[in-house]
């Protein structure tokens, strides 16, 4: 029989353990997990939600085969100053969001924390505008507080 690279034998345990330890670092998922790269790259820093200030309103074209302009806002996060794009969910929801408003954003729910559906590069959605839920504003159950 041809020899394998792994040691075999009664006392090979430590050698196998050390070999496994060294080989692990060649797997990208292990490296990302051990070094915490997902949290470092995440604008929210691993948190489920984040507060920010609306910088501007933008309309993004939907990816093929759909044809639409998805209403989004650019938000500068308070915790670290990073600017992210967040989707405004609901019919005419963009009308309730003004520049310089404080909003709460959360993940949009795409696969592996990525973009969802036909909105290119948008990983977050607006949850609240000021103290009001965007969903309640769209439904007309709450009114936006005037300053």
Swiss-Prot record:
GO terms for cellular component: small ribosomal subunit. GO terms for molecular function: rRNA binding; structural constituent of ribosome. Keywords: Ribonucleoprotein, Ribosomal protein, RNA-binding, rRNA-binding. One of its GO terms (biological process) is translation. The keyword Ribosomal protein applies. PROSITE patterns: RIBOSOMAL_S12. It comes from the Archaea. Part of the 30S ribosomal subunit. Belongs to the universal ribosomal protein uS12 family. With S4 and S5 plays an important role in translational accuracy. Located at the interface of the 30S and 50S subunits. PANTHER family: 30S RIBOSOMAL PROTEIN S12 FAMILY MEMBER (PTHR11652). This is Small ribosomal subunit protein uS12. It comes from Methanococcus vannielii (strain ATCC 35089 / DSM 1224 / JCM 13029 / OCM 148 / SB).
